[in-house]
Amino acid sequence: AGDESHALSESWKPHAHFHYLTGLTNESGSAILFDPTNPVKSKQVILFLRPLNPEMEKWDGLRKELGSELSNAVGIKTIMRTTQMPRVVADVITRTKTLATLMPLSPSGTSPDLSYWQQVASNIPECSIRDSSHIIPALRSVKSKAEIDIIQEAVNITANGFKQAMQAVRSGLNEYKVQATLEYGYAMVGGRGSAFPPIVGGGLNSTVLHYKENDKDLVDGDLVCIDS
């Protein structure tokens, strides 16, 4: 799921694969997937979350304790702390010599998940790592009714933000105020932020593909380009 950013100016987001599998947006951790056909749900997947840290939670907010409430919320029966992961992996490796990673076997930019498997495999004779990075993209390419409904809701939220921004545009208005109106339009109908920082460029700035400043006053005749 990746390491949390400690920059106060940036909000933390989990890896899209981790979010897809768990639904979690505010917890980092790991998930080990087993046989999905096993009739015992507790043996299908184990979710590992970081231990509670009362000192940090004084500043960042309380996190949920392990228990039925958390299990029901994420739909995963077995949830443990990451401190127990080495013991579980040691037990698993006695029954299989093949580990699969949902992250690409890339020679550079190795994910923490793959790095962990490589460390385990290096200590186990004949242990191999299989690239299964194609599985989740294949699953996500087919949308359920619930997912389609969520996509439509996102479309509606986006449309409202653009409508509000278009109505606000006028000569003398700064680009960042157009951005603020856009994001306000998202928030007021249930949006929780955008996938990336909005690009709002007027005049010549509208031709800059990844324009970032959003800090120019608009003038009469400007074409305003919004990417969000």
Which residues are covered by each model-predicted region?
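A composition/biophysics-driven feature that prefers long, compositionally simple stretches
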Residues: 1-160
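General N-terminal targeting signals
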Residues: 62-66, 146-148, 153, 168, ...
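Structured catalytic/translocation cores of nucleotide/phosphate-coupled proteins
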Residues: 83-87, 150-151, 164-169, 182, ...
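Short catalytic-site patches enriched in acidic/histidine residues
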Residues: 7-12, 133, 173-228
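Residue-level marker of positions within ordered structural domains that often coincide
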Residues: 37, 156, 163, 187, ...
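A charged, amphipathic alpha-helical module
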Residues: 139, 146, 160-181, 185
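Hydrophobic beta-strand core residues of beta-sandwich domains
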Residues: 93, 142, 169-170, 218
